[in-house]
Amino acid sequence: MVVSYNNNNNNNNNNNNNNISNNNNNNNMFPPFPSSDDFAMYQQSSSSGPYQETYASGPQNFGDAVYPMNGNFTLLPSDFTREPNDSFFYENDGIFDYQRIQQQPTQFQTKQRNDSQQQRFSQEQNFEIDNEVVHNNNRYYEYERSSNEVSPFDDENPNVLSDGMSPTIMATATAVTNANAPLPVNAQANNPLNFTSAPSRTVYLGNVPPNLSVKELLDHVRSGVVEDVKIIPEKMCAFVSFIDESAALLFHSDAILKRLNIGDRDIKIGWGKPTRIDPIVAARISTDGATRNVYIGRMTIEGEESHLSEEQLRVDLEEYGEIDCIKIIKEKGIAFIHFASILNAIKVVTNLPIRNPYYQNKRIFYGKDRCAFITKTQQHNAAQFLGVQPGMEHMIEFSDREFISNALLQQSAAAAAIATSAGGPNNLGNRTVYLGSLPKDVKIEEICNAVRGGLLQSIKLLNDRYVCFVTFIDPTAAAQFYAMSSLYGFTVQKKRCKVGWGKHSGPLPNALALAVSNGASRNVYVGNIDFVGDSLRDERVFTESNLRHIFQQYGEVEQINFLPEKNCCFINYTNISNAILALDKIKSNPYFKDLKINFGKDRCGNVPHQSR
């Protein structure tokens, strides 16, 4: 790690901690973050230990020169340290005037440090110099603490320092809080977490189940219009081609960040060979807005005895190509048939009315690709990132798809940096955040009142250990909450709590993801309650104690809120699965059969206090 010491004071080893500054000679401990042209992201070279990080930094005015190093870094209150035996790398474009007091300048640009050349920097502080850079009267030292230094980490939770501050989050937290800045145009080509450019419209998926269907695969795609899907069972791989690279990039980054899992298999994500869109497909997209989805209207015509069944549609249409899914809306007399490719759908729209007399009087055209619908979670994430006011998230749905994709990609890039910087590469996609040193009398309701920034899947409080594990629906929300809590602190009952990463949550189950996209949350809304009539009963039903007793049979209840003036109440569960179960079962209770039951809004998904 590189820190700056004022050149006029570098001989005073006893006052080194007082002389730490950045390139601009202010009191900020961090080097300034780079502009988009100078941005550089480096992955750590070591794969061991829980403190690995990706450190993104570099001075704005130094061109392509990069001075933060690879390796395991720990941020202490007054200095930087680096774990021993890790490699580092300097990149010199001729701007830096490299000087070395101990050795020759040529030794400065080696990829692996030479331990025999290290010399004592300060006996009092137990520092050892690795390298030194001089620029604009500032000296930049890379150094490490000796191995006999006492560990500053909490024994119970190695992800947080003893003072409650996460050691590696500060730089990446700054990246998140400044996430509105544009991402770099040219990304590192060899960076596996490249969220900024796509080499192809086609995403490769490896280790897929041999019996995987097109529908099962595309149930996981929510990033844009799909041109074509190919599954190769004998090679256990698949290729999903989109009509544009931005949609491919969003799916690629989302699959990596969320650790795409299909059929209990961890899916390998990569890029397919770059290809051009078929000229026929491109022309029909341009003129007719062609998609994989074929719309058939006027399915119920006067004189016809019955609707067209899904089985009959499959028989009539399977000759045109593999079918993804079929949806029939009988009351409207319409059907939507998704094919595996746009070309197959074009063949149906062009030839079906001609080749099959039954469809001559039907309305046949293109519908919207189901993979291009913006989910509730995407709306929520994009709204927070774009600073949309609470309650206006639905307006995101009407925004330009590419605009939303860019916002989600920038969020994904920041989330990946946060997750890997603090917990290593294996922490990518983790949705569980650890909260420690909680007040002894804390209630789970108080924690939920303090957690903001994302919908929750579950929250678990261990009262005997004064710790809590919060699992978000989306890993992006978890990473942002972790960063903001580490940067600004997380307090409950005016006590600052420790923040770290919990055990990896794994990917969100697809069934739960679909439920969330349809509005599911851990909050159950009960409306049309007659509180006046209930008060006249000998035993009231709609009291907090009675409702808690009724709803507790489906899972732990976190909070119950009453709004008598609106004739409703809200029951918040600690787990979203319990809320889904309650919504499904509560109608069997005679007191609730005539009431309006739906999902409410999870208050933990509100905008974080720091960003309001």
From Swiss-Prot:
Residues 1-57, 105-125 are annotated as: Disordered. GO terms for molecular function: mRNA 3'-UTR binding; mRNA binding. Residues 1-28 have a biased composition (Low complexity). GO terms for biological process: 3'-UTR-mediated mRNA destabilization; cellular response to cell wall damage; chromatin remodeling; mRNA splicing, via spliceosome; regulation of translation. Residues 42-57, 115-125 have a biased composition (Polar residues). CDD domains: RRM1_MRN1, RRM2_MRN1, RRM3_MRN1. Residues 201-274, 292-379, 431-504, 522-602 form the RRM domain. Disulfide bonds: none annotated. It is found in: Cytoplasm. SUPFAM superfamilies: RNA-binding domain, RBD (SSF54928). Its main location: cytoplasm. It holds the Pfam family RRM_1. GO terms for cellular component: cytoplasm; cytoplasmic stress granule; nucleus; P-body. Keywords: Cytoplasm, Repeat, RNA-binding, Translation regulation. InterPro entries: Cwc2/Slt11 (IPR039171), Mrn1_RRM1 (IPR034195), Nucleotide-bd_a/b_plait_sf (IPR012677), RBD_domain_sf (IPR035979), RRM_dom (IPR000504). PROSITE patterns: RRM. The keyword Repeat applies. PANTHER family: PRE-MRNA-SPLICING FACTOR RBM22, RNA-BINDING PROTEIN MRN1. Present with 7950 molecules/cell in log phase SD medium. RNA-binding protein that binds specific categories of mRNAs, including those that contain upstream open reading frames (uORFs) and internal ribosome entry sites (IRES). Probably involved in translational regulation. This is RNA-binding protein MRN1. It comes from Saccharomyces cerevisiae (strain ATCC 204508 / S288c). The lineage of its organism: Eukaryota, Fungi, Dikarya, Ascomycota, Saccharomycotina.
